[in-house]
């Protein structure tokens, strides 16, 4: 009897073979759920929440976040897979598949009496060799627009249908190239993702500037200005109460009137400074002038600015203030004491767009913008959410490729070649740990197998063809999902991220090893002691 039973009779215990069987079945259960998602031909899943909200997705990360997973081992694998997505932006589904397959292959040997510890030693040896092989096959190349488009397309086609993926690919790559600075890390926060429930998903576009989700608050302000100066500020243009509790006693109405005037004058002086600057820089020309303020602007100030032909937007979001100066140039001001023409940014076109009851302000045609907006359009909420998730993954894929400075062939080509390299390496591993290396090699083949299966081809037949082609030509050959025949991934432009594959090998091996070495599962928390 388990020792914990003596201490706590209500504890649930699974030992040795039973514990392993529970863990392996959990991993395989999760693998079966995500199996059909893999690759461009993967199928969709419909998630219905408790409140009845529906989500359509084939993104493994979204699925694992939204699914309610009861089993502790399955939950552990899900956390590892979502962590993979948080770090590298891709590889969630592959992660779950490989962990499940590693455990399945190990189970075959364990059922024949091999100790899990020996298999895990084989896994470690195989991982070292696999990482070494990955270093050899990675393709270091100049990350030009063509290569980045191939990388983004490979990532996006696994999330959305091909036609939409091609539209998003261009937008995603151009947005990264717009914000990229020489020898500086890429900051993806400088790409605003704005949703608009309007038109169809293929109308999604890249705006080389900014889109704000509100409009001007005065009916007489211009709806469209061209060749505009942009003043970005965080200065209150409305009467605010003092920070300390102060009062004012007056004896007559005149004194009260004086106080009101003094309070107004304080704001009016600020507005006058803006108007003076506008007259100074615009003169008699018909150039536009736009004020974007993070704080409030009261109706009197709006009216005064409107009469001067100035467009004023109030209560802009804080995250957009930094993006504004990067997109248009200029400096964000916290006071008007040192207001000068040098503080102004510039945009070729600023216009307001009304959609139903919502208003959007577009700031476009900026010179050399360092912050851009991806405007996602779609007929309904499901489509918008799906595109948003896909775009985020696409951005990460392009960023990874630039950061790595190299890519690896996709379409299951790396896995097939890696499995063959491991089998050749097997004799150099001592003793029974060779079986662990064999199990690891077989487990990696789950990726090309599932890619072929999801495309409607016979998985064994396809795999044999690819392995034969790889052995003959020595090239990295993957699955052509349209014909089921072997193809040279590099020639077609199917590229995966190097860092995703590297992270996959590390995390899958660690988790599979840890799960195999569990020989007792105890559910004996405080809750089971009650009663």
From Swiss-Prot:
The record, for InterPro entries, names: Chap_CCT_zeta (IPR012722), Chaperone_TCP-1 (IPR017998), Chaperonin_TCP-1_CS (IPR002194), Cpn60/GroEL/TCP-1 (IPR002423), GroEL-like_apical_dom_sf (IPR027409), GROEL-like_equatorial_sf (IPR027413), TCP-1-like_intermed_sf (IPR027410), TCP-1_chaperonin (IPR053374)
- One BP annotation, GO: positive regulation of telomere maintenance via telomerase
Cellular component aspect of the GO annotation: chaperonin-containing T-complex; cytoplasm; cytosol; extracellular exosome; microtubule
Identification of the protein by name: T-complex protein 1 subunit zeta
Q: From which source organism is this entry?
A: Homo sapiens (Human)
Give the catalysed reaction(s), semicolon-separated. Answer: ATP + H2O = ADP + phosphate + H(+)
- Residues the entry annotates as binding ATP: 39, 91-93, 411-412, 496, 501
Q: Which disease is it linked to?
A: De novo genetic variants in nearly every subunit of the TRiC complex, including CCT6A, have been found in individuals with a broad spectrum of brain malformations, and clinical phenotypes ranging from mild to severe epilepsy, developmental delay, intellectual disability, ataxia, and other features of cerebral malfunction.
Family as reported in the entry's similarity comment: Belongs to the TCP-1 chaperonin family.
Per UniProt, what is the name of the gene that codes for the protein in this document?
A: CCT6A
EC number(s) given by UniProt: 3.6.1.-
Per the record, residues carrying Phosphoserine are 205
């Amino acid at each position: 009897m388990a020792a914990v039973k003596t201490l706590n009779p209500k504890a649930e215990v699974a030992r040795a073979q039973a514990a392993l069987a529970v863990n392996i079945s959990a991993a395989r259960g999760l693998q079966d759920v995500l199996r059909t998602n893999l690759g461009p031909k993967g199928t969709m899943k419909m998630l219905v929440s408790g409140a009845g909200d529906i989500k359509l997705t084939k993104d493994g990360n979204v699925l694992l976040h939204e699914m309610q997973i009861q089993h502790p081992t399955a939950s552990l694998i899900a956390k590892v897979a979502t962590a993979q997505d948080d770090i590298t932006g891709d590889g969630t589904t592959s992660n779950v598949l490989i962990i499940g397959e590693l455990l399945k292959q190990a189970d075959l040997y364990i059922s024949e009496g091999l100790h899990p510890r020996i298999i895990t030693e084989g896994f470690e040896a195989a991982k070292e060799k696999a990482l070494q092989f990955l270093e050899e096959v990675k393709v270091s190349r100049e990350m030009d627009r063509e290569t980045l488009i191939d990388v983004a397309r490979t990532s996006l086609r696994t999330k959305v249908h091909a036609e939409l993926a091609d539209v998003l690919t261009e937008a995603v790559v151009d947005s990264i190239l717009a914000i990229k600075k020489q020898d500086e890390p890429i900051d993806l926060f400088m790409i605003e993702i704005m949703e608009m429930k309007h038109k169809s998903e293929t109308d999604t576009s890249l705006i080389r500037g900014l889109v704000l989700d509100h409009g001007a608050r005065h009916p007489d302000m211009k709806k469209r200005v061209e060749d505009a100066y942009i003043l970005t500020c965080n200065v209150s243009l409305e009467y605010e109460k003092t920070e300390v509790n102060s009062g004012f006693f007056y004896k007559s109405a005149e004194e009260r009137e004086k106080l009101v005037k003094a309070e107004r004058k304080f704001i009016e002086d600020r507005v006058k400074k803006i108007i003076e600057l506008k007259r100074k820089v615009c003169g008699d020309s018909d150039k536009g002038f736009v004020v974007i303020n993070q704080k409030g602007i009261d109706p009197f100030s709006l009216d005064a600015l409107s009469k001067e032909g100035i467009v004023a937007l109030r209560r802009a979001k804080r995250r957009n203030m930094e993006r504004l100066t990067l997109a248009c140039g200029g400096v964000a001001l916290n006071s008007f004491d040192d207001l000068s023409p040098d503080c102004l940014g510039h945009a070729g076109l600023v216009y307001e767009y009304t959609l139903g009851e919502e208003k959007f302000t577009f700031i476009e045609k900026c010179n050399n913008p360092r912050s851009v907006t991806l405007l996602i359009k779609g007929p309904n909420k499901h489509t918008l959410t799906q595109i948003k998730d896909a775009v985020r993954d696409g951005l990460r894929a392009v960023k990874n490729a630039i950061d790595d400075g190299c890519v690896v062939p996709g379409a299951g080509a790396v896995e097939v070649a890696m499995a063959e390299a491991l089998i050749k390496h097997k004799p150099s591993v001592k003793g029974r740990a060779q079986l662990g290396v064999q199990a690891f090699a077989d487990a990696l083949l789950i990726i090309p197998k599932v890619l072929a299966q999801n495309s409607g081809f016979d998985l064994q037949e396809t795999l044999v063809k690819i392995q034969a082609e790889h052995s003959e030509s020595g090239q990295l050959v993957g699955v052509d999902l349209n014909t089921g025949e072997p193809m040279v991934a590099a020639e077609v432009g199917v590229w995966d991220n190097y860092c995703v594959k590297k992270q996959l090998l590390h995390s899958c091996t660690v988790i599979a090893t840890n799960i195999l070495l569990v020989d007792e599962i105890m559910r004996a928390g405080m809750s089971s002691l009650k009663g």
